[in-house]
Amino acid sequence: MHAYTAVIERCSDTNLYVGHVPGFPGAHSQGATLDELHANLREVIAMLLGDGEPKLNTEFVGIQTVVVD
């Protein structure tokens, strides 16, 4: 079993959920619902893993809120 952290945003133009796995080339997708996005990400990641385990370019560390005056 493989586990990856996905970053998810909502596109204001299309109202779709858009997700990507940081540092995993090609691991991105979209969906009308979070469940659809999750299924789509699982599908694309499984397909990419068919080429072998990726060497991730980056490591997800976390998020921060930045306040600017």
Q: What residue ranges belong to the model's regions?
A:
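Short, charged, surface-exposed hinge/linker loops at domain edges
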Residues: 1-7, 35-69
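Generic low-complexity segments that are intrinsically disordered, proline-rich and/or Lys/Arg-biased
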Residues: 23-26, 55
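Short aromatic-glycine-(Arg/Gly/Cys) micro-motifs in beta-strand/loop hairpins
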Residues: 9-21
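A short, exposed loop/beta-hairpin motif centered on an aromatic-Gly-Thr core
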Residues: 25-34
